């Protein structure tokens, strides 16, 4: 039987969710099993593998797929999908996140050493991350434009790089680079400028019945194995047909 989550507690101290056997159980240990058929019956959106580099893999995450799980389980997450479908199979470690409602490039590490090396690059802000967003209206300020409004009391920096016309004259597509990775940073900064992202029900027009039109289109970092700079890009296909769906 597959469980949504499995925990082990030792001497009244909670440990992390148990994914694989790491030690023998002892007298007094307690296993806590959480099973929810509604969760396990869900079919995750299918991501596309951009490259399998062995120590890490790069994916095109679709709308609706979680980056990682919660304390209750990791069904319908990119981390779990990569563990189940990559061959040869190997563990997966999260090094950054992408909103469930967004789509685009994500990087997954498969070794502890590569996870540490990649995580340190994100922490040092040396990873280049570009996003394309279909927004309401046009950004009226001169570009490039730096937005530095703090998010949840923490420093946050976004750079609006460029803008192009969308098919709908009431909309435009902007390219955004971020130096920090705060929660919903691109969404919140664009909404602050008066140009909320199409389909953003949290910071934009709540009645819109389309997916969040936000896509991670460029990811550049140093390969932890070779030490060489690697760059991955996806096409900016926003501004045409939007897709009906669900957002956070």
Residue ranges of each PLM-predicted region?
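RNA pseudouridine synthases
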Residues: 1-248
